[in-house]
Amino acid sequence: NGSDHRFRFLRRPLVEYSPVTEKHLTDGMTVRELCSAAITMSDNTAANLLLTTIGGPKELTAFLHNMGDHVTRLDRWEPELNEAIPNDERDTTMPAAMATTLRKLLTGELLTLASRQQLIDWMEADKVAGPLLRSALPAGWFIADKSGAGERGSRGIIAALGPDGKPSRIVVIYTTGSQATMDERNRQIAEIGASLIKHW
């Protein structure tokens, strides 16, 4: 099983913010463990190692194109991909494109049922997105999400949520070009989320 293959990365330099992989320099991690670290903890080294397994950023972009997303592109690795330089098309997407892609991944036939459920489980277990949409979620609502942050005030989240315990609604929010602090950006996204939920 490829997901149980163990990667040893003692000689591979860790990149900034790698809270899980930095603890496994001697014993390594499986692909499954790297996926969990990248999604639930936003571990940057885990993301880079996973990119390596599929052939790098260009292969991820090709995969997205093959599933119909001709907008989203990944050109670089962590942490350089977070630069968010104005008018730079590298490492970018658009909310509508990402919403469609997320819906296909979570509810379409692109992945097997088991893989879809595993992805949802990892996103549901997200440990670093608490101050964002989760803080505005009504009691009993389901949420599976993945947040991100970058330079120049960039902050974002993609989420599947719903009142029925299922990922029935897709939300994608991106902000950039802001002087706001991280806490302020988190509150802004939470407020946008609260407004969306109020109108559903």
Task: Describe the function of each predicted region.
Residues 1-13, 57, 61, 112-115:
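Short, well-structured active-site flanking segments
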Residues 14-49, 57:
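Conserved catalytic neighborhood of penicillin-recognizing serine enzymes
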Residues 10-12, 39-42, 53-54, 76-79, ...:
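Active-site-proximal beta-strand/loop segments in catalytic clefts of secreted hydrolases
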Residues 38, 64, 171:
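Terminal peptide-recognition signature
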Residues 2-4, 64-69, 88, 93, ...:
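Extracytoplasmic
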Residues 6-8, 49, 170-172:
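Soluble periplasmic/extracytoplasmic beta-strand elements of cell-envelope proteins
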Residues 22, 53, 100-131, 136-142, ...:
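Structured C-terminal helix/loop/strand segments within mature extracytoplasmic catalytic/sensor domains
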Residues 30, 48-107:
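Mid-domain, small-residue-enriched loop/turn segments at the edges of structured enzyme/sensor domains
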